[in-house]
């Protein structure tokens, strides 16, 4: 634990502890380099700092997060190591997590839930295009800023933690409520697993609770692939069917029925509150699968020892064929109740055995495997003896420099310690060749010539120092903008690892961002700051009932385009504006009351612009009081503010009797 008030990593003054996860602590700190800007510093716990697998995965996942630059993803600002402690710094979000927000405001309105889920989907779209699957999406990992902006956090870190200690089932309890059916069955998490979790989160926003709960992780996991999703509308009647259908499709148990991508889900979500989908039917999938009824695999004797004692004893007492427990020969007329009780008891025992076997099948996907022993720190001879004793074969020996592990001792195994493998599998040993490394410094902001000279002094070969130029309006030419290896990385001189320095040069081009969904005023200001001439920014308005006025609907050129500010290339932004004209519906045959209500409440025609007249002639079969004529006709465009609508109601002539 870091002392409050301490300056950590020579840069961060620790203010207070604000979080404590399964394997890391989170502190609020002030970045002294950035004039005291508040950041959140996440530090890997001391007991995991000596675990090379945990450290390597922490660093790898942190770098992956650093590449995700998106307004709805918590931004990583720094990664490093201080006194043997792995850490990462990220933007501090001064707000609530979505779990707490739901608890205080449930159920969320349809509009707010759609807005928040839309932001989450945009964040995950970027992650998925970068090949990153979150695997642990839940409301606790979604932060809300004071203005209601959603930001996704903890990309992959939770997964790296869980893989280091597979026996810590408590770490699963926090996210099993959002676990996809395929993950519950033991399959690898995919993009569609993230989509399932977002569907469960969406359900929770609109109802105030999770759909599946129970006393244990096993009970909850079983429900994910056995129990149908409870109806959202039954609990929250204000939810339209089109919106519930988004949740139904996102949480489909079969992958073939589920959204294939977050983009597909985002498009469907965007129109879920549209008037055009008001009469949509409920989605119903056939979720039955042969996999649900297949024969249970044979359970080994070693696996049976893991069943709780009560279950194991019950299995020994069960009979071979319960259906033959009572026959004509064994029937005793003097005590029928006793035998009926015995029969029920035997059936109950058989059921318990079946349930136990089912749980073993679910929780032990590879019942014949055993965990690889942890031989880190042992000599090669000791490690070989330990592995052979566990019935593993010895594979290749590889050497690797290490700052912490003594020469000739084991750094790690491949596959890693704790990983399940079958007996007889060859296990490779990674042996320390001693110290042959140095710590990478922070080169950003320094002159590239000085950095190159420093690296050469540390014996880094010329051919491993690569310079890449990048245009910049903000930094002086020749200044290092980025470095491929973060500050604090241990650089091994025995490996041909390239160091890439991105150096500033005078800018003439910019990368266009994704402006769709953003406010046009903000985007125009941003483009001007990037030296795009105002006369080259063209705004085209387009009516929309789905997008908020002033929001960008389309852009040209598209996101990611390299734009040369020195050339007169026009940027066109299509901006949403309020709908002022619609196609006239047909009211022929409708009642006057229905027609007026529909025109005023649904179409948006002002009551003062509606004229009702009575006519005495009408087509045969017309009922009195029904609309027989309308102007404008059905399908014609009407201006909601100017067009006058004329409705003709059939009123037959009354004939008086002749005296």
Swiss-Prot record:
GO cellular component: plasma membrane
Biotechnology annotation for this entry: Was identified as an important pneumococcal antigen that provides significant cross-protection in models of pneumococcal sepsis and pneumonia. Was selected as one of the lead candidates for development of a new pneumococcus protein-based vaccine. Is a component of a trivalent recombinant protein-based vaccine candidate for protection against S.pneumoniae, whose initial formulation development evaluations are described in PubMed:22538529.
InterPro entries from the UniProt entry: Kinase-like_dom_sf, PASTA_dom, Prot_kinase_dom, Protein_kinase_ATP_BS, Ser/Thr_kinase_AS
Domain PASTA: 366-433, 434-505, 506-577, 578-651
SUPFAM superfamilies, per database record: Protein kinase-like (PK-like)
Keyword ATP-binding carried by entry: yes
Role of this protein: Protein kinase involved in signal transduction pathways that regulate various cellular processes. Likely senses intracellular peptidoglycan subunits present in the cell division septa of actively growing cells; thus, intracellular unlinked peptidoglycan may serve as the signal molecules that trigger StkP phosphorylation activity on a set of substrates. Plays a crucial role in the regulation of cell shape and cell division of S.pneumoniae through control of at least DivIVA activity. StkP also plays an important role for bacterial survival in vivo.
Record-level Gene Ontology MF annotations: ATP binding; protein serine kinase activity; protein serine/threonine kinase activity
Keyword Cytoplasm appears in the UniProt entry: no
Catalytic site: 136
Domain notes: Consists of an N-terminal kinase domain, a transmembrane domain, and a C-terminal domain containing four repeats of the PASTA signature sequence (Penicillin-binding protein and Ser/Thr protein kinase associated domain). The PASTA domain binds to peptidoglycan (PGN) subunits, is essential for StkP activation and substrate phosphorylation, and is responsible for cellular targeting to midcell.
A Pfam entry, by short name: PASTA
Recorded superkingdom: Bacteria
Extracellular side: 364-659
Protein kinase domain boundaries: 12-273
SMART domains reported for this sequence: PASTA, S_TKc
The entry's keywords: ATP-binding, Cell cycle, Cell division, Cell membrane, Cell shape, Kinase, Membrane, Nucleotide-binding, Phosphoprotein, Repeat, Septation, Serine/threonine-protein kinase, Transferase, Transmembrane, Transmembrane helix, Virulence
Recorded topology in the membrane: Single-pass membrane protein
PTM note: Autophosphorylation occurs predominantly at the threonine residue and weakly at the serine residue. Dephosphorylated by PhpP.
Residues in compartment: Cytoplasmic: 1-342
Renumbered residue ranges of the record's region Disordered: 541-561
UniProt record similarity statement: Belongs to the protein kinase superfamily. Ser/Thr protein kinase family.
Protein name per the record: Serine/threonine-protein kinase StkP
Source taxonomy: Bacteria, Bacillati, Bacillota, Bacilli, Lactobacillales
Gene3D superfamilies: 3.30.10.20, Phosphorylase Kinase, domain 1, Transferase(Phosphotransferase) domain 1
Localization, UniProt: Cell membrane
